[in-house]
Amino acid sequence: MARISSTQPRKQRKFRYNAPIHTRGAFLHSPLASDLREKYGKRSFRVVTGDTVKVLRGEFKGIEGVVDGVDVKNTKVLVHGVYVKKANGEDVPRPLDPSKIMITKLNTKDAVRVARLEVKA
């Protein structure tokens, strides 16, 4: 059965808000660096903890760090080195959107993930 899609922004926001967890994984894809793109023949791949990423947009642009965590529910990524100061001086991690970061080095500890990388689209 084909999924019916709408071009209305309110329905797109509603779809993302109400999406089940297994569908939200698709929202967590980030573009691959050019060397990884050539090696694996893929433009983007899902971000996991342990990947090395580079921030492409925002006030933290240019910072490169390891992914500390992935929030599937809110579709955000936590990167080591990307912090904001609270009023009391405490550093808290700043969640980033996966579309605003680029994967520069993949975490290849998971055999299933490596096998998925090798599959040509």
Swiss-Prot record:
SUPFAM superfamilies: Translation proteins SH3-like domain. This is Large ribosomal subunit protein uL24. Belongs to the universal ribosomal protein uL24 family. It comes from the Archaea. The keyword rRNA-binding applies. The keyword Nucleotidyltransferase does not apply. Coiled coil: none annotated. One of its GO terms (molecular function) is rRNA binding. One of two assembly initiator proteins, it binds directly to the 5'-end of the 23S rRNA, where it nucleates assembly of the 50S subunit. Keywords: Ribonucleoprotein, Ribosomal protein, RNA-binding, rRNA-binding. InterPro entries: KOW, Rib_uL2_dom2, Ribosomal_uL24_CS, Ribosomal_uL24_euk/arc, Ribosomal_uL24_KOW, Translation_prot_SH3-like_sf. It holds the Pfam family Ribosomal_L26. The gene is rpl24. One of its GO terms (cellular component) is large ribosomal subunit. Part of the 50S ribosomal subunit. GO terms for biological process: translation.
